[in-house]
Amino acid sequence: VIAQMVALIVTVTPSIRNLPRFIFMMAGPLVTGLAFTIWLLFASRLRWQEKLALVIAGIAFPLIASQISDFDDALRTTMWIYGVPLAELMITLALSIWSQAPRRCLLAVLLLGLGWSSFALVRNEGFDGDYYAEFRWRWSPRHEDRLPELTPQSGVTPETSENADAPVNDLLWSQYRGPEGNGSSNEEIPPLDWSKNPPKELWRISIGPGWGSFSYNNQKLFTQEQRSEKEHITCYAAVDGSVIWTHADTTRFNEVVSGAGPRSTPSVVNGHVYALGGTGLLTCLNEVDGTVVWQKNLVSEFGAPIPMWGFSGSPLILEDKLIIFAGGPEKNGLLALECAAGNTLWGFPSTDMNYTTARPMTLCGQSVVVFCDGKGAHAIDPNDGSAVWTFKPELWKGPAMVDPQQIGPDSLIVGLGDGVGTARLEVSKTDDQWTVTEAWSSTKLRPSFNDCVVFDNGVYGFNQAIFSCIDATTGERKWQGGRYGFGQAMLLKKAGQILVAAENGDVVLLKATPEKLTELSRLPMLNDKTWNHPIVADNRLFLRNGKTAVCLQLVE
């Protein structure tokens, strides 16, 4: 029992890396359950009739609980994680309270029954970043059941459809993580003072589950969401949040930790919307009305397995190419497809689980696409998919969770794995020979799935659940202290400020300085688990999670 309690404590200790915590969470009940059963049967002083009764009860009550509970994968996992140690505790408690047979056995059976039947009262909607279960009363309505139909309200109007084929404004947010792919807004927004001029809420709507962000173009917002068995790519009017159009496919991705819904963010370029669903449907739509131009299934057409947490990388549009991770065999790993028709142009081998988006960079004067997988960081020639260089930092562990990010003419930072750390790479080229060196590796910034931003020689991001800043030159910690859970951040470059979407749904405004943590304001906003990246476009902050989307005007 003590060993099981230790395993549970390790599971929810944020300072420990996610993989060991996950192993303790799943293996702890198995190891301690077997040890407890062996002790009960062979080392305890119970009568054989009591041992038999407890074994029967220990098998029967979980089976009964599974029949009377709202028994899905999330609750099944919860019953394993919490039910086994609860059963051990109930038996130990009964034997400690009553030493006489058969009363001690009757009490143990009674407590076992009460413990296991309690799972019939709740359901589990997933886990947060610290692996705390999100329990809800079983009878409380599910969010998806309360969602209205996605019916176009505003239609296609001149305001929303004009200039759909015009070049995308490079100040706006037409692809995942913004115009430069680094979570930074270049808009002329002055420093914000929410104590004197708080943001004005323009609209708020209910939205389906999904962990992707918004993209923005021509006064329209594009995102992905789940509605029952339909996975939607939806276009909303930025002015009021009304539905302009939606495209639905009959597919549903769902997993225990984060629940249902797609994970990717659409890209909007040259009048088309490109989106990747959680089960691997890659779709090109007309930006104006949402009609299908082409669609590919990464699983059936490229032999790609669905990753544990679903397909999560967003389409990168580079001139006439769409670059996306599939993870299929041979050269069906990272793919380049024609934007116009979806035909395959090239492939780069990569079969590891991957949850990142490839990034275009210019290093040593050469245009490359940088992509991370279990083998390290790769620079790839976007013209033919050939490897320019590959480098694996010393602390590297897969799978890749956060995007690589260029921070200098010949330097970039990469995440080292889920909760492992961050490294800075320096790249040089002599004639045709490339050299990649590791300037530093830091365990002072250990992101899970949370991307960082860079400003004033500081790298700002999540050291697990604590917002932190490290020196971009040395990797040394500058400060740590923002308790924002496993959230996401973006940079208002002109204002020198950072907007953090905290995991609990709060919006936090920080001064972007490596000197110290300076929290300027914190506003409750979404009031639920929020893993989605915030975006800023046309003086408005757009934020969503798996239940709600909201629009805030930043400056009057």
Question: Language-model segments: what does each one mean?
Answer:
Residues 6-99:
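Membrane-embedded alpha-helical segments of integral membrane proteins
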Residues 100-126:
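Internal/C-terminal transmembrane anchor helices
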Residues 138-206, 232-234, 239-255, 291-304, ...:
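Aromatic (tryptophan-biased) beta-strands that constitute blades/sheets of beta-rich domains
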Residues 196, 202-215, 230, 246-267, ...:
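Extracytoplasmic beta-rich repeat domains
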Residues 218-219, 270-271, 319-320, 365-367, ...:
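Short coil/turn segments that connect the beta-strands within blades of beta-propeller domains
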Residues 237-240, 286-289, 338-341, 381-385, ...:
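Short loop/turn segments that connect beta-strands within beta-propeller blades
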Residues 420, 505, 527-556:
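Blade-level signature of beta-propeller repeat domains, shared across WD40, Kelch, NHL, RCC1
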Residues 420-422, 442-512:
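Loop/turn-rich, solvent-exposed surfaces of beta-rich toroidal or solenoidal domains
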